[in-house]
Amino acid sequence: MSSSRIPQCENSSRLSLSSIFRYFGTTSTIATMSPKKVTIIGSGNWGSAIARIVGSTTKSFPDEFDPTVRMWVFEEIVNGEKLSEVINNRHENIKYLPGKVLPNNVVAVTDLVESCEGSNVLVFVVPHQFVKGICEKLVGKIPADTQAISLIKGISFDKTNQGVSTEKRGGLKLISEEIKEILKIEVSVLMGANLAPEVANDNFCEATIGCKRKAEDGPLLKKLFHTDNFRINVVEDAHTVELCGALKNVVACAAGFTDGLGYGDNTKAAVIRLGLMETTKFVEHYYPGSNLQTFFESCGIADLITTCYGGRNRKVCEAFVKTGKSMAEVEKELLNGQSAQGPLTAEEVYLMMHKTGLDAKFPLFTAVHKICAGEMKPAELVDCLRNHPEHM
């Protein structure tokens, strides 16, 4: 290479660092940051489906991500074998996602702290009632610049009214807020019309990432999840994205009740519409300033429709009506050790609405809780819909 093409110092004998940066570019040829290490916290049906995606994308972007993806697994014995060993040896979650191969760079780790050690990105995908306990075990164990993203569809009810300005919200705390409050790190969210079995089958679908620091964190998170069949859109309205993901499970319970009662698609359509109306009002009341456009993302109307026709909450609530069994019995029979988040979210939503005197303004949400709690008969739901304030 001729001297005219190489930046040199005045004495032409050695290169200055600034000259090298000007020649090569500070962000391209010379790498200033090591690849990000990713940990998936959770290994259920949804967590394992997401692991298939993340395991693939991390290998596709070796400059951005470390190729090894650690997945925290709550150890179980399945057919006489440790689940973690089955995942690591046969690359299959035989309990929660049987028949689907996990990428060989996804490594099951049973120790929570060990699974997160040195990680730069934490993907939370566990039932929402376990988040607080998990985060408390990680306090002081992760760097302050760690990014987190929650795929958890639920909310936290703060009975003490302590923490993130929850008093004016009747104790409402988003899962992302709970993670951020405990771990002191930035938290984004991913929600959408994403039934786990279909995602695992690589069926085309969309998802929404809610990222308050869209310019700083959005591009990396999109690379982590975006594929040909899992299309990601990033928005800044993270609170709305997250609440849509939580509240749609409550509406899906109502849809399941109407299915169990033998009503048709017209009635279910009414449930979906009224549920959407209550969702938009709930978001605007507790988190003023939401963007209406967010409800038209995958996290909004699309997820609501999908869950009311195909989700586990609908399925469980239909069986609850038809069999007369308790919710716990139905979950045990139908969900293979997992739980429906709708009934618990409905209870938490009701408690915070009741505390702020708003339960009468959200009759569908209120009815779902009371039916799940045995305080109202499922057949009374239609009367609730018939007398909804939207019809007055």
Swiss-Prot record:
GO molecular function: glycerol-3-phosphate dehydrogenase (NAD+) activity; glycerol-3-phosphate dehydrogenase (quinone) activity; NAD binding; protein homodimerization activity
Pfam families: NAD_Gly3P_dh_C, NAD_Gly3P_dh_N
Active-site residues, record numbering mapped to chain: K248 (proton acceptor)
Major location (coarse): cytoplasm
Annotated substrate binding sites: K153, R312, N313
Cellular compartment(s): Cytoplasm
Family (UniProt): Belongs to the NAD-dependent glycerol-3-phosphate dehydrogenase family.
Species per Swiss-Prot/TrEMBL record: Caenorhabditis elegans
Catalytic reactions of this protein: sn-glycerol 3-phosphate + NAD(+) = dihydroxyacetone phosphate + NADH + H(+)
NCBIfam families membership: glycerol3P_DH
Sequence positions that bind NAD(+): G42, S43, G44, N45, W46, G47, F130, K153, A196, R312, Q341
Alphabetized PROSITE patterns for the sequence: NAD_G3PDH
EC numbers: 1.1.1.8
Superkingdom field: Eukaryota
Class in the EC hierarchy, top level: oxidoreductase
A GO cellular-component term linked to this record: cytosol
Keywords: Cytoplasm, NAD, Oxidoreductase
Protein name: Probable glycerol-3-phosphate dehydrogenase 2
GO annotation terms (biological process): carbohydrate metabolic process; glycerol-3-phosphate catabolic process; glycerol-3-phosphate metabolic process; hyperosmotic response; intracellular accumulation of glycerol
Keyword Cytoplasm: yes
Assembly behavior: Homodimer.
This protein's encoding gene: gpdh-2
